[in-house]
Amino acid sequence: MSEALKERKEMDPQYQWDLTKMYASDAEWEKAFAAIDPKIEALAAWEGKLNNAASIREFYDAEIGVFRELENLAVYTSLRLSEDTRADDAQSMDARATAKYVKAVGTIAYAQPEILALPQETLDAIMDDEQVAPYRFALEDLLRAKPHTLTAPEEKLLAAFGEAFGTPKNVADNLEDADMVFDSVKDGEGNDVELTASNYILLQTSNDRALRKNAFESYYKSFRQHINTLAASYSGAVKTAAAEASVRHYESSRAMSMAGENVPGQVYDNLVATVRKHLPDMYRYVALRKRILGVDELHYYDVYAPLTKGVSAHYTYDQAKQMVLDAVAPLGEEYGTIVRKGFAERWIDVFPNKGKSGGAYSGGSYDSNPYIMCNFTGTLDSVSTIAHEMGHSMHSWFSRHTQPAQYADYTLFVAEVASTVNENLLIEHLLAEKNQDPATRLALLNQYLENFKGTVYRQTMFAEFERDAHAMAERGEALNPAALNNLYKKLIVDYFGPELVVDDEVQYEWARIPHFYRPFYVYKYATGYSTAVALSEGILKNGEPAVKKYLEFLHMGGSAYPLDELRHAGVDLTTPAPVDAALDKFGRILDEAEACVAQLEAAK
């Protein structure tokens, strides 16, 4: 069914990203790396002097310059490492770049506490001085964190542990990407099929149930064999977050995480409560799967299976590019031109190869073009992934070409909005095609339903897992394999309902979710998707006025708080309304899917 993966050097370079635009070679990177130390050390010159507007402006200008260079160094090595996680040179470069970044953070650890220790009248005078105008919002944000900022020596000490704090994630990443081996599996005809981290989800979307079952069991067999290590690494990450929250005088690690973006806890709680209110529609979707697949028992290895047999379209990469371009056409000529530029100038690393990181992401630095890492396999989901990651990249492109470096990075809270708008525009574009037979339309509706399931329901389930795991640690309870497995299994039962048989392997799934090592990130997928539903519907229904507000949002970067940016785009997430409306749409799509099934059944 699937070809054996090639080594990277055997792949066609035209389908690989072009990193020479960052550094012509690793040797050029080494030169830049060797030159950074004196610049980092020079940042210490302002210690004890940040008591007036002129000094603060000079310091921030210098800091931005150094960290732009550090970002280039770190992004390049991260991209190189993604190409082949087994490569010793890339591992070494990435570790060195991380260490240098940690050194720089430690060097400037004095700055925030020094500014925050100033008398209020001095701070007021500084804020009113036009010399700090380019950094006024950043300073306002800093002053908001005053109760949670430590003394200069304490901040420096905490910064020194920065690299060590990343160890739990590094352990899990290296174990899963480089060391874990998955046994090959048999398909329904007895053929051997290679199983990798990159193709696991693809195999779960096969019409071959035996292949799905065998891949599911083999995949989680490896996680079961390493579950003690994975539980220990995750426990370490949770305890690290809890310790920092305590030291910084937050009531919890969740409060610390959300405070960084000025998002109140009610947004998180509204999400969970609203999604739980709509769980009956998820149970209806699970029941529809069971009905269509015609199985006596629906297992977890059935939840990604196509709802229509014989409708398993395969797309070439060229077709995928055109589909994305057609889908984003409503966003205007400039948007489409830049997407074409990305395709033509090799922003994208397209196909899987041995050692390549699984999944997909958009990266890059302020001074580089965006880069997209994906593992394209020709499915509709793969096409959707390109649309998704290009949405991230376009958000970055507009932000970096509009905002100064200090405001170019948008927050994680809004990070999934642009990507999901693109996904929704793609699926709406495909659904708008005329004269679709019920089977083809059902396949598209299934993709839409899967997007909702994966991005709203599933990510909210993850958010509950994360909330409860962190709360357990904060109560002093052990996060051992049994505790984490039981917590996750209960949530699977709650979210998928009575029609799903919960196999033993399901309880290990939490261990494969890398986002758990970025505390309280996953809920933003769900809020982002709900926002994207509102925005994409507005773009398609209202045209230019909605497009204008949306593109303005993409240009804002991190120049305002995320909830304010979304209000500018027309969505208020401090109320349950956007999530409610999104899941009402899920119900309507499900109604149409059920109607397609009825048509197909009547035609038999």
Name every feature range the model reports, one short phrase each.
Residues 292-327, 336, 395, 449-455, ...:
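Long, K/E/R/D-enriched contiguous segments that form extended
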Residues 391-405:
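Catalytic Zn2+-binding segment of zinc metalloproteases
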Residues 1-310, 596-604:
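A well-structured
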Residues 313-315, 348-368:
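Catalytic zinc-binding patch centered on the HExxH motif and its immediate surroundings
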Residues 410-438, 448-450, 454, 528:
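Post-HExxH zinc-binding segment in Zn-dependent metallohydrolases
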Residues 313, 367-387:
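Short pre-active-site segment immediately N-terminal to the catalytic Zn-binding motif
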